């Protein structure tokens, strides 16, 4: 196993925990069930935060489950070896996560009533968060510098491919009734209201005190202190420095890292790539 990428259908994956044959099975053979709830994101867009919220919604705010079972078991990654196997044996209703672009997602989803919550985030913050996260992980190709990672991200030669392609692939689904589009920014700005929106989408109701418990137990500080959610359980086989894996949980951190030239270049790239999508889709713009 090397610090490189596994390539499948032109998309990069880690070399540990993923296999081309499993990725093919996920797309062609995995059966999505109508009761499934799926968290769909491009990496570093708030996946674990949303998973924590959904787990707490399931337990009505009670923290016992999230404090006793690792987050990757509560919401497994369907495309990973472990996740694919576990989910195939899990009874309904299932909660799981995926970073897959639309062309690699299980085909069975498109004829199912399963519910997808797609969480997107300002790609500038995604870029910064990804740089600090991935450089601490083993079994992936690492950039020599921040500048090199910036270039890779703009070109789409990073894990799970281009952010722009990921968004473009999934956005046509946003009008479907089993697809909820959210942004990290709105979740951050008004977490309570966004949780209510998720409840409405999933057909769930929460008492005010249950909502307050969810807000308390899914806060960044609570997650950082919860060893089942903060990655501290990850084996040293996977990680270089665990301290960096849950960093800030804020919006706008990119301003502390982009040079003026990088900010200008990225603005130009964003305008070019996203010109065909309505501006109001992106609350950070």
From Swiss-Prot:
Subject to substrate inhibition. Alternate orientations for binding of steroid substrates to SULT2A1 may play a role in substrate inhibition. The active site is at 99 (proton acceptor). Gene3D superfamilies: P-loop containing nucleotide triphosphate hydrolases. 3'-phosphoadenylyl sulfate binds at residues 44-49, 121, 129, 184, 218, 223, 247-249. Liver, adrenal and at lower level in the kidney. Is present in human fetus in higher level in the adrenal than the liver and the kidney. It catalyses: an alcohol + 3'-phosphoadenylyl sulfate = an alkyl sulfate + adenosine 3',5'-bisphosphate + H(+); (24S)-hydroxycholesterol + 3'-phosphoadenylyl sulfate = (24S)-hydroxycholesterol 24-sulfate + adenosine 3',5'-bisphosphate + H(+); (24S)-hydroxycholesterol + 3'-phosphoadenylyl sulfate = (24S)-hydroxycholesterol 3-sulfate + adenosine 3',5'-bisphosphate + H(+); (24S)-hydroxycholesterol 24-sulfate + 3'-phosphoadenylyl sulfate = (24S)-hydroxycholesterol 3,24-disulfate + adenosine 3',5'-bisphosphate + H(+). It is an enzyme of class 2 (transferase). One of its GO terms (molecular function) is sulfotransferase activity. Keywords: Bile acid catabolism, Cytoplasm, Lipid degradation, Lipid metabolism, Phosphoprotein, Steroid metabolism, Transferase. GO terms for biological process: 3'-phosphoadenosine 5'-phosphosulfate metabolic process; bile acid catabolic process; cholesterol metabolic process; ethanol catabolic process; lipid catabolic process; steroid metabolic process; sulfation; thyroid hormone metabolic process. PANTHER family: SULFOTRANSFERASE SULT. Homodimer. This is Sulfotransferase 2A1. It comes from Homo sapiens. The gene is SULT2A1.
